[in-house]
Design a protein with these regions (language model features):
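Intrinsically disordered, metal-sensing/regulatory segments
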Residues: 1-248
């Protein structure tokens, strides 16, 4: 039988993954309102970087030493960068106000990219929770928050093409990739328990890359710097609140 810890991890991963549906729903509701999106991007980038640098990496260094932790961090960044190169995680954007069948065709490639990019997030969640339930909950919240503006940005152009059913199906399948990643994380921890501190640093590398490579350029594209900074400040406030409310 599965332990309560494993069940809790899988439920957290599933709930976090399914926040992709919220991103799609907001894209349908707000459509061309990008102010909400830019604040969300800033908030998402801030919360993921804060948890990576102030939670995951310090815990990894404390348990495994700085050299091993940095190597694992580099490997995490490198693997996601390679994955991003092989399957580019492109956010679809209208060109000159036109939407055509080429956009929908490209959407399938984006959907595939979303699934592959969500997989390591589930892995990060599982390893963090095994090390500390409080830390795991923080990571789950960070990933859930990150999913919303990311899916919003992906979905908004296709909403204009009136492909809502495709969007929800894509978001749902993408969300299921996180529990799948969590299962992989649990298997890794079960068979390689001594490596769990390194898995956390590895996961931090993945989260840092996602923030810097996807969220920051996405915000730059919308040219709303003040709203992006507002989102970052909100993330700091929420992060500090969560560290007080959620026990380690």
């Amino acid at each position: 039988m599965l332990s309560t810890t494993y069940i809790a991890i899988l439920i957290l991963a599933l709930l976090s993954g399914l926040t992709t549906l919220i991103g799609v729903a907001l894209a349908i509701y707000f459509k061309k309102n990008i102010k909400f999106l830019v604040i969300g991007i800033g908030f998402s980038a801030g919360i993921m970087l804060l948890i990576s640098f102030f939670e995951l990496i310090p815990e990894s260094v404390k348990a495994a030493g700085i050299v091993k932790a940095l190597i694992a961090l580099f490997l995490g960044i490198s693997l996601i960068a390679l994955l991003n190169f092989i399957v580019p995680h492109t956010h679809l954007v209208k060109e000159k106000g036109r939407i055509d069948h080429h956009l929908i065709k490209a959407a399938y490639l984006v959907a595939f990219g979303l699934i592959l990019h969500d997989f390591p997030e589930g892995f990060a969640m599982a390893n963090s929770y095994i090390y500390s339930p409080g830390l795991g909950l923080l990571v789950a919240l960070a990933i859930a928050i990150h999913n919303i503006p990311e899916e919003f940005a992906m979905a908004a152009p296709i909403v204009l093409a009136k492909s809502k059913s495709f969007l929800y199906k894509t978001a749902f399948i993408s969300g299921l990739a996180e529990p799948a990643g969590a299962v992989l994380g649990l298997v890794a921890v079960h068979f390689f328990q001594a490596l769990n501190p390194l898995f956390m640093s590895f996961a931090a590398g993945a989260m840092i890359f996602i923030s810097l490579d996807e969220l920051f350029p996405m915000a730059k594209r919308y040219k709303k710097t003040s709203l992006f900074v507002l989102g970052i400040f909100l993330s700091i406030f929420v992060y500090l609140s969560l560290t007080i409310l959620i026990p380690g």
